Regions:
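Conserved pre-ATP/AMP-binding loop-to-beta segment of ANL
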Residues: 1-12, 45-48
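Conserved S/T- and glycine-rich ATP-binding loop of Class I adenylate-forming
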Residues: 13-16, 49, 64, 94, ...
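Glycine-rich helix-loop-beta junction characteristic of Rossmann-like nucleotide cofactor-binding loops
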Residues: 39-43, 105
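Gly/Ser/Thr-rich phosphate-binding loop
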Residues: 108-157
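AMP-binding/adenylate-forming core of the ANL superfamily
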Residues: 170-182
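AMP-binding/adenylate-forming
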Residues: 25-32, 48-103
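Short Gly/Pro-enriched turn/cap motifs at secondary-structure boundaries
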Residues: 160-164
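Conserved AMP-binding A3 loop
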Residues: 8-35, 42
């Protein structure tokens, strides 16, 4: 789909907040999201990344788009609950869901920067991450925002209690009390 002449792609939501559905998104928006992630985490051409989530959902798809757009080296492993098992090389950037993070905690020294999305990270797990050398960020986002729009560092000297909007993203509440993301 990425190399098709169409300006849009179909992505599928996971159904975490209701029934799974298909949505159309512009490739330009996907490129913008990839570049925002690259700028936020200081990714540069040749950095190594890990795809350990299914490509049928936005998180996996966006890891591929980031690699293509930013010139990153992409290592692909079968999605599993312990994706770092069998990885011998150092990974500069990876994305996981909380269960993958929990099952990989003893191998996180293989990853420089890790983002975690798809669900809240348990406070007990966050406590276990405090001496891990990896920079670990919980993300806030959804398929409709093409992954994360806010991050919260979970460990290290810059850890935070609150999510911070990424550069150029801001939030407001509308008349109905609903969150609006710009």
């Amino acid at each position: 789909d990425w190399y098709s002449p169409n300006d849009e792609m179909t992505l599928h939501t996971s159904g975490s907040t209701g029934s799974p559905k298909s949505i159309q998104v512009k490739k330009e928006w996907m490129r913008n999201s990839a570049n925002l992630t690259g700028n936020t985490f200081g990714l540069k051409e040749g950095d190594s990344t890990l795809l350990c989530m299914p490509m049928k959902y936005v998180a996996g798809t966006m890891m591929v788009v980031r690699a293509l757009e930013l010139g990153l080296d992409l290592t692909i492993v079968e999605p599993s609950s312990n994706p770092l098992e069998g990885i011998s090389e150092q990974i500069d950037f990876a994305a996981m869901v909380p269960i993958q993070l929990e099952n990989s905690i003893d191998q996180l020294d293989k990853v420089k920067t890790l983002i975690v999305g798809g669900g809240q990270v348990d406070p007990k797990l966050i406590k276990r991450l405090q001496n891990v050398p990896t920079d670990i960020y919980e993300t806030y986002g959804m398929t409709e925002t093409l992954t994360h729009v806010a991050i919260k560092q979970l460990n290290g000297s810059n850890k935070s209690k609150f999510f911070q909007a990424l550069d150029g993203v801001h939030f407001e509440v509308d008349d109905r009390g609903c969150l609006v993301i710009h």
